[in-house]
């Protein structure tokens, strides 16, 4: 309705309660890069919906294929992983809850880049490390921008735990440990910059909540 009126980035939703900030809601996908699919003028709304779902299923399959190749699986295993993940019930069923379908589509790129990083760390390949940082950060950022920061946080926790385990194990050299910590810092910085348009409005809107200044303990 807003798009038909020429308002592609609505800032206020007056139909939710007494009014609500659209950018301030963490589940809104206002700045998600694939959102313009919903504005294609030559398609009907059901066709846009179908295109959006199919595109993300293809992205999910591609991401898992990327992860499978980084794990050195053969072509048959990689293709099986692509089909079994993209068409699995937990992923395919999210066509009815699109923000989770969007985040599921980027998980493969997230963990595939981590596998690439571990290999690059072992062989001290700086270019491969840099590529892994970019792919990992952008995949996490896409999860946040699509309105599912919870999955992004879960992936970030698993990634941080894996990297910390890698750099602080046994006889790891100081240089390798510093590179691992540098990866975490670089990834966090890049994610914060890419998603600033998302988390800054959410943080500012949260400051309007009475719970921010409340001294009452809940449920007591």
What is each model feature region?
Residues 58-71, 75-121, 128-169, 183-202:
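Membrane-embedded helix bundles of polyisoprenyl
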């Amino acid at each position: 309705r807003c798009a038909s009126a020429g308002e592609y980035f609505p800032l206020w939703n007056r139909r939710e309660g007494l009014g609500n900030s659209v950018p301030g809601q963490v589940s809104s996908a206002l700045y998600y890069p694939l959102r313009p699919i919903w504005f294609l003028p030559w398609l009907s709304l059901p066709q846009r919906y179908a295109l959006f779902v199919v595109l993300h299923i293809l992205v999910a399959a591609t991401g898992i294929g990327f992860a499978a190749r980084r794990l050195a699986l053969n072509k048959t295993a990689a293709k099986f992983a692509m089909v079994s993940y993209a068409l699995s019930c937990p992923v395919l069923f999210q066509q009815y809850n699109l923000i989770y379908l969007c985040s599921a589509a980027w998980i493969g790129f997230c963990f595939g880049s981590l596998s690439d990083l571990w290999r690059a760390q072992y062989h001290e390949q700086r270019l491969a490390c840099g590529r892994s940082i970019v792919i990992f950060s952008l995949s996490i950022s896409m999860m946040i921008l699509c309105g599912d920061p919870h999955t992004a946080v879960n992936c970030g926790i698993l990634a941080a735990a894996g990297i910390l385990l890698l750099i602080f194990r046994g006889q790891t050299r100081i240089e390798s440990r510093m590179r691992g910590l540098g990866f975490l810092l670089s990834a966090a910085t890049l994610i914060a910059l890419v998603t600033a348009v998302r988390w800054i409005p959410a943080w500012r809107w949260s400051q309007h909540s009475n719970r921010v200044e409340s001294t009452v303990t809940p449920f007591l």
